Amino acid sequence: MDTPENVLQMLEAHMQSYKGNDPLGEWERYIQWVEENFPENKEYLITLLEHLMKEFLDKKKYHNDPRFISYCLKFAEYNSDLHQFFEFLYNHGIGTLSSPLYIAWAGHLEAQGELQHASAVLQRGIQNQAEPREFLQQQYRLFQTRLTETHLPAQARTSEPLHNVQVLNQMITSKSNPGNNMACISKNQGSELSGVISSACDKESNMERRVITISKSEYSVHSSLASKVDVEQVVMYCKEKLIRGESEFSFEELRAQKYNQRRKHEQWVNEDRHYMKRKEANAFEEQLLKQKMDELHKKLHQVVETSHEDLPASQERSEVNPARMGPSVGSQQELRAPCLPVTYQQTPVNMEKNPREAPPVVPPLANAISAALVSPATSQSIAPPVPLKAQTVTDSMFAVASKDAGCVNKSTHEFKPQSGAEIKEGCETHKVANTSSFHTTPNTSLGMVQATPSKVQPSPTVHTKEALGFIMNMFQAPTLPDISDDKDEWQSLDQNEDAFEAQFQKNVRSSGAWGVNKIISSLSSAFHVFEDGNKENYGLPQPKNKPTGARTFGERSVSRLPSKPKEEVPHAEEFLDDSTVWGIRCNKTLAPSPKSPGDFTSAAQLASTPFHKLPVESVHILEDKENVVAKQCTQATLDSCEENMVVPSRDGKFSPIQEKSPKQALSSHMYSASLLRLSQPAAGGVLTCEAELGVEACRLTDTDAAIAEDPPDAIAGLQAEWMQMSSLGTVDAPNFIVGNPWDDKLIFKLLSGLSKPVSSYPNTFEWQCKLPAIKPKTEFQLGSKLVYVHHLLGEGAFAQVYEATQGDLNDAKNKQKFVLKVQKPANPWEFYIGTQLMERLKPSMQHMFMKFYSAHLFQNGSVLVGELYSYGTLLNAINLYKNTPEKVMPQGLVISFAMRMLYMIEQVHDCEIIHGDIKPDNFILGNGFLEQDDEDDLSAGLALIDLGQSIDMKLFPKGTIFTAKCETSGFQCVEMLSNKPWNYQIDYFGVAATVYCMLFGTYMKVKNEGGECKPEGLFRRLPHLDMWNEFFHVMLNIPDCHHLPSLDLLRQKLKKVFQQHYTNKIRALRNRLIVLLLECKRSRK
């Protein structure tokens, strides 16, 4: 009879001459022959399996072959250290795509009590998409079920086997019945992989336990039985570890101690592995970014050199940035005069002559402040004060007055500590005074002289550069009203501008809003541009450890009255990210609705109450960005974070325009000097948290833009020209009026009446369950996809946006990144608008708008899966220029982006859709902006996002108009504030406000002069002045809903200027912006 050794020699000789494609098949037949003919010769089988592994270890063809994996697992049954053996297989790539390997590995770890490690092994198999996948997922679910059942300590103790006893039993019975014993061992080990133990092994194991017992001594009670079968006596346990002095530990206590030590070690090992993987990924990505930045630097250097050689000197002078140059003092005085009404110019003189007669209403106002802050219900009943007719101004914030002319000099040397609530932002707190939008340049070298605020940009001295970074940002933080007994008297104005700047630099006192009250403001430095928390439009976050420097667009101080010093407002860490979004559709931070006065409660602590009763002649309308509607004497606020509402008495009307009576109507003279506050309230205005995450209201005061008058005849005749070239043509006369197009009931009715419901879309999935828990650094099942959530991009009150990945996390090339917009309650409207927009647009235009891949609707929320944009919003790009010498975006880029915006809105309107929420942080930059090389489309990569406020005009009768105010957006159009009907005008205004942000780095405020709306900061030193005057005149002065300007004609005029001046420069400007974006992205890692 042939022996196995002889057959093996024959096999080896055969394999040397074998030329087939499957050598493993020959080995398989030989091993089967050995198992059938020599079942008891286990030692030879182990040697044969070891020889087989060495033969095929380096052959990648068989690494995931089921036959080879099965032999590896069979060899593992005879291995003493299974965990090390499985790691050896995995590190050599054997079985990485095979489910049996992971199941066997996890089964061994589970038997050892290493449940967390076992779970990690199964998860790794699922991530690697091991086959068969269904079987692996089933075993993972069974493992989780067993895990929940073994949480009780008693169950954990009874379910864990005594491995030493099993080994001893096997050794005792090995000679008496070796065949059956080995079969039992094989079955037991197989049961660890499958979770099922055969009854035969149970029976034999029970019989063996009756033979061997555990004793405190090192010898078994039935030692004679062991001696008969010539088996060495094995010590069951170490007495030194259990018996210590007079006390004795139990096995459970010893096992628990070892388990805790092993668990801590495994946790440390896992953390170290995770850290190394993350470090390698970051290093790889940083290397790619560095290579790309080096290439861009080289291209930028080459383009700049060529552009400097071809640039005429005259052209350079015409394009000097307005923030960096300024006329002489004499020219400033000459330019200042036409900007102010006659009453304003006479006010300082009159106040100097009789300073104690100027503020006759100060005591009543001071009392009204205290009453309003302590008891809002009482303050609302106080009658309005006498209007300050002599102090009406056109300034964007307030006029400065004083009781004593000498107090200016006195305040220059005195610093009054702020006693109000401190706002903790970052590592330090700056305390400055809230100022007007006069560009007051602090220059402390001028000494103690009185001054008048300057209305134009001063010369770029060293002090000016310091002041620009200082003053520019003090309006960039929210106002928290505090109870105050401050009744300091007003400060007077003088004619010397420089002394006022010096006084402003050193003193923390400032007069109140509209020249009535004083406000103490503290400048916060720990959060960035337009930041109101992690908001859902996932702009690119700024680095957390940003060096101290010039403030950026959106930083604001906290304005309040002096109050008791113990009150403190906690700092919100979410404000360290500039991924902002305005206008979440379900935003509760809304102004009061006339239809539901019962929704409002009494005033709360965070309610921002007016510092004084504003006279009707002084303020026409005050609007806080996105959150606030101001009334004539009282203001209303909804705190969306706590859903606490603060409103005036229920008897009054809530709309600021509807509230006015005919007696309160402004005369034409006073109206021409009043201001429409379109994006920020006065210092006494209402403040709320814009993004539902804190008490921040992102509002700005224009401190850098010089105020100048337009030539009276500069834009004569433009009205007729633009109205004749309307892009939408003449709209039919409205035959249908809708109050609020964003009403939840109306939207539900519109969605219910669709001929093709949203639920019928192929990429819409409805789940009859609640929204799963979605957290960073976790994975969850979304339909048939296993999604891994990386981190939170932005967060609002009702929506969070996460960056997620589908696919292998370790495979950087094949993994697909996207965003998850999670909303509670569900919001199918935004998905409907996005889908309709893609259907109505031409395929070549779809890349300019955000695309949703799918929508998952749950019972209590929704998840929208959309395209990921990696380089932040246009708002972030605007802020990046704050740390550059020019401080604002270059003109070439502004015109390029403006042309792209006009084209986007034209396409949206052609689809009969109103976006409804145009603003800088709803334009986002993707990879296309870095990769595109088209000469004619250098603003490619810019996309429009956030369709939650959009309106589908096809669902309404033709010519429908709306009357509601866009209460969830700070960019309210002129028609809303003047109580006129509107439809497409809201997008026109949004584009104008966004372009203004790019030009000046501040929010736009509009004034009405003689019935014509103009941006408050105009543009005396701005290049292409005529073009921008015409642009803002067309976008802000739309007669009605029937005659809309032509966006295409306006875009062609911008294109003409662009081609004349910036064709040779735009690529260098774009490359520089790319470098800034890449550096910003790398710095936040």
UniProtKB/Swiss-Prot annotation:
Pfam families: Mad3_BUB1_I, Pkinase. The KEN box is required for its ubiquitination and degradation. Residues 305-333, 538-570 are annotated as: Disordered. Its EC number is 2.7.11.1. It catalyses: L-seryl-[protein] + ATP = O-phospho-L-seryl-[protein] + ADP + H(+); L-threonyl-[protein] + ATP = O-phospho-L-threonyl-[protein] + ADP + H(+). Residues 229-256 are annotated as: Necessary for interaction with BUB3. The gene is BUB1. One of its GO terms (molecular function) is ATP binding. Residues 787-1085 form the Protein kinase domain. The lineage of its organism: Eukaryota, Metazoa, Chordata, Craniata, Vertebrata. Upon spindle-assembly checkpoint activation it is hyperphosphorylated and its kinase activity toward CDC20 is stimulated. Phosphorylation at Thr-609 is required for interaction with PLK1, phosphorylation at this site probably creates a binding site for the POLO-box domain of PLK1, thus enhancing the PLK1-BUB1 interaction. Ubiquitinated and degraded during mitotic exit by APC/C-Cdh1. The active site is at D917. This is Mitotic checkpoint serine/threonine-protein kinase BUB1.
